[in-house]
Amino acid sequence: MVQKLRRGYTTGTCAAGAAKAAALALWRGEEVQEITLTLPRGEIITLPVTVHKGVEEAEAIIIKDAGDDPDVTHGVAIHVRARKQAGGITLRGGEGIGIVTRPGLAVPVGEPAINPVPRAMIKEAVAAIVPPGLGMELEISIPEGARLARRTLNPRLGIEGGLSILGTTGIVEPMSEEAFRNSLVPQIDVALAAGWETLVLTPGRLGQRQAEEKYGLPATAIILTSNFIGYLLEACVERRVKRVLLWGHGGKLVKVAGGIFYTHSHVADARQEIIAALAAAAGASREIVQQILAATTVEAVQEVIRGSDFEPGFWDSLAARASQRATDLVHGELTVGTALLNLQGDIMGRDEVARQIMGDWGYDR
């Protein structure tokens, strides 16, 4: 029996909890030792916190617990310092928080790397505490951030000087190798028991949510793969699944088009090289190929090739190549379609099998 792995909390959750504790100290004089927080999915959690109250400001510190996930930020101290201001809630990045220096990310250039969901979580956590008509400045810092950021993809993404405040659900799902990989397989059994012969394989919860909420794909047919796309494809063959739709962000699934089936960025990250090679084969100029290689995200690549002669059908052909490589992996024993999404959940490209599968489920646009 596979032991259940312990979940942890994102940097965004820790920052929101620390912000709430600092706000309580600043406005109400309460120096709490634990703080209760509601996560984006409605789950209520309680985190231990240390609070220091000064005359004009308050600071709260939460130690990040990543659970059983091998996370570089596990055990780091996330600080939030709160100060009163005339109106509104302002977020600032302090020591160890990276600054976005290149376009294509979810945060504008020049802003601290605090992603949209954590920003909303932080503001929601303190909104009811700040008196009407008044405001507060919140400065988030991670003293070890600059050092730890060198062990992440932030430097390659153009996020300089520190770590990012991340998270979409507030929860860190454990991703330790064999145990976690094995724990994913029962999802297939449950889906088959529900009567599905076609499954959706998606690397993460953002893709899962977009599939369900934006496109109406059946929730019980959606399988989370994390980075183990190849392993789950082979598990589908073993269980005689008939069709699979690979579904997710283009930056993840483009790796499959290059024959990469374990997609963790520490093991394989050739996104730009794969796209550049396929663009060159489609007729891209040398200048465009160089710009693709210099881009940091798929969204940035979209802007590079927008309006080019080869753009029409390019992302569809990339999706088709991912499907072909996946089909080759399982020796043709599975019919595979692929749909590539951007960060907003819009379909960048999909092949004919993906269109057919989505059409069978009532989405035929």
Swiss-Prot record:
It comes from the Bacteria. Its EC number is 2.1.1.195. This is Cobalt-precorrin-5B C(1)-methyltransferase. It comes from Moorella thermoacetica (strain ATCC 39073 / JCM 9320). InterPro entries: CbiD, CbiD_sf. GO terms for molecular function: cobalt-precorrin-5B C1-methyltransferase activity. It is an enzyme of class 2 (transferase). The lineage of its organism: Bacteria, Bacillati, Bacillota, Clostridia, Moorellales. NCBIfam families: cbiD, PRK00075.1-1. GO terms for biological process: anaerobic cobalamin biosynthetic process; methylation. Keywords: Cobalamin biosynthesis, Methyltransferase, S-adenosyl-L-methionine, Transferase.
